[in-house]
């Protein structure tokens, strides 16, 4: 995975994530939309055969797009940890 910043402003961030597809894009965008201060979050895959996605984040100024992205990643990490614990509990 390689991440490049395509555009960065005080309340807007556009990233290209190489080596990923809809699986990660949908998870990140959906999680971002639940964060207070995020006005818009989306992703798209420029071409069906490419293995890269473009993520766009727009905030209302109460949080920076970078902080919103970091918070989304922490939320995803927490969700996956919870699911791992639940699955481990099922196998006992």
UniProtKB/Swiss-Prot annotation:
SUPFAM superfamilies registered for this protein in UniProt: RBP11-like subunits of RNA polymerase (SSF55257)
GO biological process entries: DNA-templated transcription
UniProt cross-references to CDD domains, sorted A to Z: RNAP_RPB11_like
UniProt GO molecular function: DNA binding; DNA-directed RNA polymerase activity; protein dimerization activity
The enzyme's E.C. designation: 2.7.7.6
UniProt-annotated location(s): Cytoplasm
Catalytic activity, as annotated: RNA(n) + a ribonucleoside 5'-triphosphate = RNA(n+1) + diphosphate
Pfam families with a match to the protein in the record: RNA_pol_L_2
Keyword presence, Nucleotidyltransferase: yes
Main location: cytoplasm
Keywords carried by this UniProt record: Cytoplasm, DNA-directed RNA polymerase, Nucleotidyltransferase, Transcription, Transferase
Subunit structure: Part of the 13-subunit RNA polymerase complex.
Protein family according to the UniProt entry: Belongs to the archaeal Rpo11/eukaryotic RPB11/RPC19 RNA polymerase subunit family.
Record HAMAP family: RNApol_arch_Rpo11 (MF_00261)
Name of the molecule in the record: DNA-directed RNA polymerase subunit Rpo11
Organism listed in the record: Saccharolobus solfataricus (strain ATCC 35092 / DSM 1617 / JCM 11322 / P2) (Sulfolobus solfataricus)
